[in-house]
UniProtKB/Swiss-Prot annotation:
GO terms for biological process: epidermis development; germline cell cycle switching, mitotic to meiotic cell cycle; keratinocyte proliferation; kidney development; meiotic cell cycle phase transition; mesoderm development; negative regulation of keratinocyte proliferation; negative regulation of meiotic cell cycle phase transition. It is found in: Nucleus. Expressed in skin, testis, kidney and weakly in lung. Not detected in heart, brain, spleen, liver and skeletal muscle. GO terms for molecular function: DNA-binding transcription factor activity; DNA-binding transcription repressor activity, RNA polymerase II-specific; RNA polymerase II cis-regulatory region sequence-specific DNA binding; zinc ion binding. GO terms for cellular component: nucleus. This is Putative transcription factor Ovo-like 1. A zinc finger (C2H2-type) spans 118-140, 146-168, 174-197, 213-236. The gene is Ovol1.
Length: 267
């Protein structure tokens, strides 16, 4: 049996070094932090023929296999070196935090098609469109124009008021066709269909969904404005929305008649 299988040879170049053997003036040039996981460079020696000797530095060999950009020095101890690119930003806490901050700001603010952002001068929040900024500015108004008749809470938008009132009346017009759940908003129904039933809504880019006319008195829904008005006349003749709609219809009818009379002088 060969002697190599019986006697284990001492490792001539290990990753651990006896620093007591070095003079003080040479320690600073040779020292490499152990936290980086790198072995100190060793002079090259011709390896002896041995079939049973394992790698003397498995940590450095494992790191060299993970990243092909590391260079491997010849010899029994593999020495891993940093790549040529600048990686100082990975060790500098200040630059690392700034990098993360820039990425977060891109996700939060979004990228405007024209590169212009509309910024709120009160809270410094930015938007990609002027209409979004105009809607946001309403939240800074101290006077709330639209008040809830149930609890007195004020809102600056009729949409927010309508959504809030449904929490008092219990009106849930958007019903799931696959179960018994109903929701106050269309987006909540679409989220329910996607997460619970796995139904993905297919809409084209900027495609408007079919409008649903909801009776805030009883929760009845209609697909057309005419059907909604007929329902109000039959079931809720004293509804303020019906009076408002009647005024709009009367004004539209008067404008139509006026335009017809101006276009036909012989009438």
């Amino acid at each position: 049996m060969p002697r190599a299988f019986l006697v284990k040879k001492p490792c001539v170049s290990t990753c651990k070094r006896n620093w007591s053997e070095l003079p003080d003036e040479e320690r600073g040039e040779i020292y490499v932090p152990v936290s980086l996981g790198f072995c100190p460079p060793q002079p090259y020696r011709e390896p002896e023929a041995s079939v049973a000797e394992p790698p003397s530095c498995p940590l450095a060999l494992d790191m060299s296999l993970r990243d092909s950009s590391y260079s491997v020095a010849p010899g029994p101890c593999v020495v891993a070196q940093l790549p040529s690119e600048d990686v100082s930003h990975l060790t500098d806490p200040q630059s690392r935090d700034q990098g993360f901050l820039r990425t977060k700001m891109k996700v939060t603010l979004g990228d405007s098609p024209n590169g212009d952002l509309f910024t709120c001068h009160i809270c410094q929040k930015s938007f990609t469109h002027q209409r979004m900024l105009n809607r946001h500015m309403k939240c800074h108004n101290d006077v709330k124009r639209h008040l809830c008749t149930y609890c007195g809470k004020g809102f600056n938008d009729t949409f927010d008021l309508k959504r809030h009132v449904r929490t008092h009346t219990g009106v849930r017009p958007y019903k799931c066709s696959l179960c018994d759940k109903a929701f106050t908003q269309r987006c909540s129904l679409e989220s329910h269909l996607k997460k619970i039933h796995g139904v993905q809504q297919k809409y084209a880019y900027k495609e408007r969904r079919a409008k649903l006319y909801v009776c805030e008195e009883c929760g009845c829904t209609s697909e057309s404005q005419e059907g909604h008005v007929l329902h109000l006349k039959e079931r809720h003749p004293d509804s303020p929305l019906l009076r408002k709609t009647s005024k709009k219809v009367a004004v539209a009818l008067q404008n139509t008649v006026t335009s017809l009379l101006q276009g036909s002088p012989h009438l």
